[in-house]
Amino acid sequence: MIIDRLLQRSHSHLPILQATFGLERESLRIHQPTQRVAQTPHPKTLGSRNYHPYIQTDYSEPQLELITPIAKDSQEAIRFLKAISDVAGRSINHDEYLWPLSMPPKVREEDIQIAQLEDAFEYDYRKYLEKTYGKLIQSISGIHYNLGLGQELLTSLFELSQADNAIDFQNQLYMKLSQNFLRYRWLLTYLYGASPVAEEDFLDQKLNNPVRSLRNSHLGYVNHKDIRISYTSLKDYVNDLENAVKSGQLIAEKEFYSPVRLRGSKACRNYLEKGITYLEFRTFDLNPFSPIGITQETVDTVHLFLLALLWIDSSSHIDQDIKEANRLNDLIALSHPLEKLPNQAPVSDLVDAMQSVIQHFNLSPYYQDLLESVKRQIQSPELTVAGQLLEMIEGLSLETFGQRQGQIYHDYAWEAPYALKGYETMELSTQLLLFDVIQKGVNFEVLDEQDQFLKLWHNSHIEYVKNGNMTSKDNYIVPLAMANKVVTKKILDEKHFPTPFGDEFTDRKEALNYFSQIQDKPIVVKPKSTNFGLGISIFKTSANLASYEKAIDIAFTEDSAILVEEYIEGTEYRFFVLEGDCIAVLLRVAANVVGDGIHTISQLVKLKNQNPLRGYDHRSPLEVIELGEVEQLMLEQQGYTVNSIPPEGTKIELRRNSNISTGGDSIDVTNTMDPTYKQLAAEMAEAMGAWVCGVDLIIPNATQAYSKDKKNATCIELNFNPLMYMHTYCQEGPGQSITPRILAKLFPEL
């Protein structure tokens, strides 16, 4: 079977970049007040380690392992890792942060508690590692990079090879990649090594100078020297590994800490028949200059590097070559961070192969830029990660830098707690739900990002969610009924719930003729089936014919049918009902500022806009307050300008409408709202058959309990997909977390 020079013989349109990616990040939890390894147990907020697909513990209780799902491209893998890191950083105790370096801070054996896992084998395995290698070495952290070649790519190469058996071909291809990785991994150690020092008493021998990567040297986490596994063929590899376990040299196959692992089966013998499906590359130190420990550019450069390894011919003396390459890697790992690659390192072979891959397959200029960056780092070691890290070392210690950098990333995680890193372009309620999904260990897939459509599953239990709370729990007809204001009104009227008096019109002339019945009454004119307050005109006293006619025309521009209803005096509240229980109540107040007798209105607006919850284009729970034409007209009607200095305590209205989208305030009144109104809202949602419902009630005096006789509350609208984030992150009040309750209802077994 011919494996070498397959890429050279491939056509330029081969899907060479097609691959699947997975990243694993290890990080220690650090107790900020003491700046030592945290002694607290694994956070209960992170669900159960028995099944959590994204957040586990590695060797010790404080060492988190963050695991991305399989990603179809490198960008998605980085996106996953950003989100999982964000969730982990905000789920640990608030006085803890994740250590950004591979080498731990000062730590003693007694500070390291073995992960308290329920699986007896996993716990006993860690006890064995303690006896065999010691606890301290287990506290080193890193990044594991998983890559599987794309199926179309594998099929094309298989056909080109004219091999007889697809699994044998796939195994040989992955074995070649593994062999060449072990021959050339020293370049990655040079570029990305980031463990230059160990803190006091960590190593048995003392280092006099910083090095490039302790973790990737013989001083790092490696097997004992008597462990020898051949890479000559897959069969030799399997036999040697099985014999090492049988002889007691290894307690299990996974104790073999090779820089590259064959993956796809739990037992290595299965690879012979079922095939290797991907490889795990374990040589990456945490990059402390990235909040997630690795950068997009690194992931893509490594991908190009791996393709170059397929371009390079195999070795005819692989075990001997790997032995020599290991010595070279150790030399580079223990060299000074500003020392260039040694002369015996065949770096030109790698650079030429990477260049050939770029040219042969017409890769985008992005990959050429990545290669140029590699070339610059080869010429200038100070540009490598270890080279940049060198100036951060103080007295052969990185503790101060690690503490500072870890705190920066901790603060960054909490900077916008309503957003999920990596998914900021999605609707806020969906981001909040995804945070909870990752935190609790529910598997997820974004089926359609534009449509906010998610697939969630745990074991065989699958749920589909749209826009954060539209699920199978609601009958299909329910949102259709609530989207139609006339249908909603009729259903509520039949159940004797209070709704505004009014009528529906599909003809402009008929709507105009209705004026005689309402000309002396306060009214609201609105489209029949619209949202976000579009096309609505409010007349708090009464309307003249000209104004009424204009309001009709505005409403008809939004819908083919309109409603003319009585205007109800009072305060509007949004009630959030979930499965018959009102769990949140919100008061929305129009954009405003309150005078302090010192600042102008313009300055007061700027001060209020400093609230981190305020932003633009619905990317934050609250919108920035503008001072445009509408707001300035409103000020003029009150006798103010933007330069006026209102007296202390004077409330200045900047808008009439209370929409959050136009700078309004959200005020959580859940705990103070009279329970009779909560019950009323819940009963209205139940009457509609709604699992999730936003109920808008006008209440003249919320301090008085609701009475059916007095009907001192009126429902003006029901919403089938109510926003959730505005209940959680409010201008005032404690806020109510809704998405965790949605998730708990969907997956009660968790």
Swiss-Prot record:
Residue intervals of the ATP-grasp domain: 489-747
GO cellular component, one term: cytosol
Residue numbers binding Mg(2+) 2: 717, 719
Entry binding sites for ATP: 516-574
Catalytic activity: L-cysteine + L-glutamate + ATP = gamma-L-glutamyl-L-cysteine + ADP + phosphate + H(+); gamma-L-glutamyl-L-cysteine + glycine + ATP = glutathione + ADP + phosphate + H(+)
The keyword Metal-binding is assigned to this record: yes
Region of interest (Disordered), ranges: 32-51
Protein name: Glutathione biosynthesis bifunctional protein GshAB
Lineage: Bacteria, Bacillati, Bacillota, Bacilli, Lactobacillales
